[in-house]
């Protein structure tokens, strides 16, 4: 090492070092260092100046920043997250530590940027590829077409004509064409000038003229001159039919020429020409570029791994989709050579090949893969003769005797006796197949079937179907007492073998037994598994749900078994007895229902509804004394029951025992004086035309129950029937003072005033009623109808709009609004109504009537069915439905609607109640009321 060399040489100078400053030297410059002088207007060349000091503009900005001491620190320039928009320290000196801090921040930013760089670049690349895929360049769109230019020969290139100056000649020299229509007189004149000239103009004979001999002279008939054409006498009109025939003839000639051509490889069939054109349309919807990419990718996979079966299958299917079936066949056959042990490749090859070739392919596959079941199944499917199928399957069973699928396919082709023999062998080869054992048991006799099932249980002790089949076998042969034992033994045996008893699966098996007609088996299964896996407090609820589910699945015997078991567990539960009674009423016989009700009232004597159901069942069958005895027993169990009193009164009045009914009502008024008892007493006297007695009873009832609106309504209606309008008005007004929220009372009073002719008073009453009962759709509807009946349709529409604003979910208002619209707007209104009230029966009924008015019979019937299904208690829906069937249905449909209505027993509906509650119709049956209401309907909507 050189000791004379100073250690600081080659090192950077310390901060603030100025050369020569320590020895007192000062720097100086000469003119050669500065350069020549510049003019003030010359551009400043400060390229080598430090940033911020290069130009005059930079100096001005610096001076301005120095002069501008107060920054913009207003609230509008402040952000909670970023602070002020500008730097608070921009006017301060930029020192070394600031530079170091900026370098650290820059390094951090660079580091963070590098961490996300790969993911960001990948995302940007995917976005660019997606954009290029959605919006490819024109160059990319025509790239596949440009590749075909390589196939153009040099002669074809040279034969392309030069464009020359004609390229833009029309644009450079515009020529304005004038098109003038030819007058009709021109065509008429030339069509009529078809005469022959019989003389020669003398001017034509000068200079030798036409008579001068001329080689092939002009007198010689000119080719085409005398043929049909210009010399043919004109007819005055064009024959378009002949023009069409000529065009067809020309097309036939061209097709014939092509079909007779032998220069090409194919010959065109004229008859199938258009069909062939349609078949040439490609069936795939992918882009041609995507197909080419997929083809290249699959080719690469095949070359990289030629023993990969999915690559060959995918390649063949790609060619098949693109319409190149022969290429697909060639590829898949090459695949069978490269992958001879792949079952999927052989099956795909058999699928792509035509019939005979496919058989050969399958035969070759069997030689390579003699143990594969699907190949044998495919071979059997390719055979058309039953004997050939049997031969193939038997050959397959020689190689694969333990295949259940092959045995099943072979047995299906045999006759019953041969199938039984084959199944005997099948269960030996496949002893764990439940299906084969059960199939053999079905074909055997009773004794042999029992032996077969016993062997099946020995081989498969964990399957429930064998036990259930054994129970069904015993039931089918009359041994019903064994069914219960077999099912109980099955539960015990399965649990002993570690099988979990799945309650849902057993219930499904019971439903299948029910549908198959094995009633005892399904009931035994239900009794055995109904209580498994259920908490004690959830039993009742779960069992009722199970019963409903069975009814929905049409497994009625299963539901009956559930109710029977539930009644044994809960004998004192009224709700269970009621559910069972309703089930028996809908799905059982009258005798079973009455027996059930007798047991029910014995366990639940306080359940009034059970007594009433029993009495009604007897009454409907015409056994009035039995109904009376049931009600007498009900009185003993429920001495002061209003329902039983009224049921007894109805029974006597319906059978014309009016004195008995009066005595019963008198006893009821003394022992159980309720408002309904008084109301029935008044109505009985009213319908018997004992007006005075009815009025006295009504006054007595009102002294006890003045807040019961139906009594006031009956009082007013009796006065109205006697034409005592003032007294009727007074009765309604008194009733409204006591019952201001009774909508029927308001309606009766308003209709009374309208009947008298006091429209102004009617409007006032309805407005007052709406104030006392806001959001009441019935009152709004009556107000709208009042204006409509008065002929003020504009006011009616205005009121309807207000009503829908106050009651936007009212079905009766929407149904009325539909038919207030003009016919073209009704459909739109009905759509709005369905959006607001999708499941309201009034809206559904209005839609059905709308379809009816448009003569869309099928749709109208569908909507009527939907209406009565949603609300079977709406009598108006049944009446309109019955009227519809009277006009457009058969007698069977009419009878069906009537019977369904009688079973539903509707009680509500505006038109229905107007007829059913009329005093003149008090003894009418449901069917009679239905006919009366339907007779009043006029389909003028």
Curated annotation (Swiss-Prot):
GO molecular function: protein-macromolecule adaptor activity
Biased composition (Acidic residues): 66-78
GO cellular component terms, semicolon-separated: catalytic step 2 spliceosome; nuclear speck; U2-type precatalytic spliceosome; U4/U6 x U5 tri-snRNP complex
Membrane-spanning segments: none
GO BP field: mRNA splicing, via spliceosome; spliceosomal tri-snRNP complex assembly
Ranges of the HAT repeats in the UniProt entry: 384-416, 418-444, 445-476, 554-586, 588-620, 622-654, 689-721, 723-755, 855-887
Composition bias type Basic and acidic residues, residue spans: 39-65
Keyword Glycoprotein in annotation: no
Keywords: mRNA processing, mRNA splicing, Nucleus, Phosphoprotein, Repeat, Spliceosome
A Pfam short name: TPR_19
Domain of life: Eukaryota
Region Disordered: start-end pairs: 1-79
Coiled coil (residue ranges): none
Sites of Phosphothreonine modification: 180, 266, 275
Phosphoserine: modified positions: 143, 279
Record's subunit section: Identified in the spliceosome B complex. Identified in the spliceosome C complex. Associates with the U5 snRNP particle. Component of the U4/U6-U5 tri-snRNP complex composed of the U4, U6 and U5 snRNAs and at least PRPF3, PRPF4, PRPF6, PRPF8, PRPF31, SNRNP200, TXNL4A, SNRNP40, DDX23, CD2BP2, PPIH, SNU13, EFTUD2, SART1 and USP39, LSm proteins LSm2-8 and Sm proteins. Interacts with ARAF1. Interacts with AR and NR3C1, but not ESR1, independently of the presence of hormones. Interacts with USH1G.
Name under which the protein is recorded: Pre-mRNA-processing factor 6
């Amino acid at each position: 090492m050189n000791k004379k060399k100073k250690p600081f040489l080659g090192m950077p100078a310390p901060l603030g070092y100025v050369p020569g400053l320590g020895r007192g030297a000062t720097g100086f410059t000469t003119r050669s260092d500065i350069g020549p002088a510049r003019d003030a207007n010359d551009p400043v060349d400060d390229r080598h100046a430090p940033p911020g000091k290069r130009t005059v503009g930079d100096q001005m900005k610096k001076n301005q920043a120095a002069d501008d001491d107060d920054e913009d620190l207003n609230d509008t320039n402040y952000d909670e997250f970023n602070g002020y928009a500008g730097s608070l320290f921009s006017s301060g000196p930029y020192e070394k530590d600031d530079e170091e801090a900026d370098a650290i921040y820059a390094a951090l930013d660079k580091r963070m940027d590098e961490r996300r760089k790969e993911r960001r670049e990948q995302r940007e690349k995917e976005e660019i590829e997606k954009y290029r895929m959605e919006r490819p360049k024109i160059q990319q769109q025509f790239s596949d077409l440009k590749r075909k230019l390589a196939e153009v020969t040099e002669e074809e290139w040279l034969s392309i004509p030069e464009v020359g100056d004609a390229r833009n000649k029309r644009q450079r020299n515009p020529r304005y064409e004038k098109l003038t229509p030819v007058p009709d007189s021109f065509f008429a004149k030339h069509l009529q000038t078809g005469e022959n000239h019989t003389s020669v103009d003398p001017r034509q004979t000068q200079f030798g003229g036409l008579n001068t001999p001329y080689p092939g002279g002009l007198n010689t008939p000119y080719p085409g001159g005398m043929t049909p054409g210009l010399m043919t006498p004109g007819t005055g009109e064009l024959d378009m039919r002949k023009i069409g025939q000529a065009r067809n003839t020309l097309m036939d000639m061209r097709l014939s020429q092509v079909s007779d051509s032998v220069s090409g490889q194919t010959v065109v069939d004229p008859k199938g020409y258009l069909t062939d054109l349609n078949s040439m349309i490609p069936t795939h919807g992918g882009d041609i570029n995507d197909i080419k990419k997929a083809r290249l990718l699959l080719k690469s996979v095949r070359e990289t791994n030629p023993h990969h079966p999915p690559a060959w299958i995918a390649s063949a299917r790609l060619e098949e989709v693109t319409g190149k079936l022969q290429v697909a066949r060639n590829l898949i056959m090459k695949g069978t050579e490269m992958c001879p042990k792949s079952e999927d490749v052989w099956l795909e090859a058999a699928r792509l090949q035509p019939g005979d070739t496919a058989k050969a392919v399958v035969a070759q596959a069997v030689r390579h893969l003699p143990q594969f079941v699907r190949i044998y199944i495919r071979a059997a499917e390719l055979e058309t003769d039953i004997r050939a199928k049997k031969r193939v399957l038997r050959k397959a069973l020689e190689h694969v005797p333990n295949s259940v699928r092959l045995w099943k396919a072979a047995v299906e082709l045999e006759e019953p006796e041969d199938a039984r023999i084959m199944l005997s062998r099948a269960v030996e080869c496949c002893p764990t197949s439940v299906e084969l054992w059960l199939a053999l048991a079905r074909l055997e006799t009773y004794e042999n079937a029992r032996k077969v099932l016993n062997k099946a249980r020995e081989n498969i002790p964990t399957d429930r179907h064998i036990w259930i089949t054994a129970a069904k076998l015993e039931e089918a042969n009359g041994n019903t007492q064994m069914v219960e034992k077999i099912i109980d033994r099955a539960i015990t045996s399965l649990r002993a073998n570690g099988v979990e008893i799945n309650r849902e699966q057993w219930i499904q098996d019971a439903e299948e037994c029910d549908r198959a007609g094995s009633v005892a088996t399904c009931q035994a299964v239900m009794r055995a598994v109904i209580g498994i896996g259920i908490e004690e407090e959830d039993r009742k609820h779960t069992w009722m749900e199970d019963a409903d589910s069975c009814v929905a699945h049409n497994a009625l015997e299963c539901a009956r078994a559930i109710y029977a078991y539930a009644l044994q567990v809960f004998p004192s539960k009224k709700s269970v007895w009621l559910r069972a009674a309703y089930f028996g009423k809908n799905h059982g016989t009258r005798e079973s229902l009455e027996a059930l009700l007798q047991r029910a009232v014995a366990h639940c004597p306080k359940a009034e509804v059970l007594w009433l159901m029993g009495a009604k069942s007897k009454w409907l069958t015409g056994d009035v004394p039995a109904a009376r005895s049931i009600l007498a027993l009900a009185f003993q169990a429920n001495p002061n029951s209003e329902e039983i009193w009224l049921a007894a009164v109805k029974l006597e009045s319906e059978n014309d025992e009016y004195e008995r009914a009066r005595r019963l009502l008198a006893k009821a008024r003394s022992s159980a004086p309720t408002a309904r008892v008084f109301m029935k007493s008044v109505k009985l006297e009213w319908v018997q035309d004992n007006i005075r007695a009815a009025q006295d009873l009504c006054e007595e009832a009102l002294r006890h129950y003045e807040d019961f609106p139906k009594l006031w309504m009956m009082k007013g209606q009796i006065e109205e029937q006697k034409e005592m309008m003032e007294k009727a008005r007074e009765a309604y007004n008194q009733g409204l003072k006591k019952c201001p929220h009774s909508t029927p009372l308001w309606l009766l009073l308003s209709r009374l005033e309208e009947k008298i002719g006091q429209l102004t008073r009617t409007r006032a009453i309805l407005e007052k009623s709406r104030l006392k009962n806001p959001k009441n759709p019935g009152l709004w509807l009556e107000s709208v109808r009042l204006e409509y009946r008065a002929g003020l349709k504009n006011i009616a529409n205005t009121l309807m709009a207000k009503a829908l604003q106050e009651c936007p979910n009212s079905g009766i208002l929407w149904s009325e609004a539909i038919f207030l619209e003009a016919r073209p707007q009704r459909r739109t209104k009905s759509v709005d109504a369905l959006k607001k009230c999708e499941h309201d029966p009034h809206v559904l009924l209005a839609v059905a009537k709308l379809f009816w008015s448009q003569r869309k019979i099928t749709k109208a019937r569908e909507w009527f069915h939907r209406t009565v299904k949603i609300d079977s208690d709406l009598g108006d829906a049944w009446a309109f439905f019955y009227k519809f069937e009277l006009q457009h249905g058969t007698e069977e449909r009419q009878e069906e609607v009537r019977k369904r209505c009688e079973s539903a027993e509707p009680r509500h509906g505006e038109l229905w109640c107007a007829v059913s509650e009329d005093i003149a119709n008090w003894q009418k049956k449901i069917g009679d009321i239905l006919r009366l209401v339907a007779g009043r309907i006029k389909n003028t909507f």
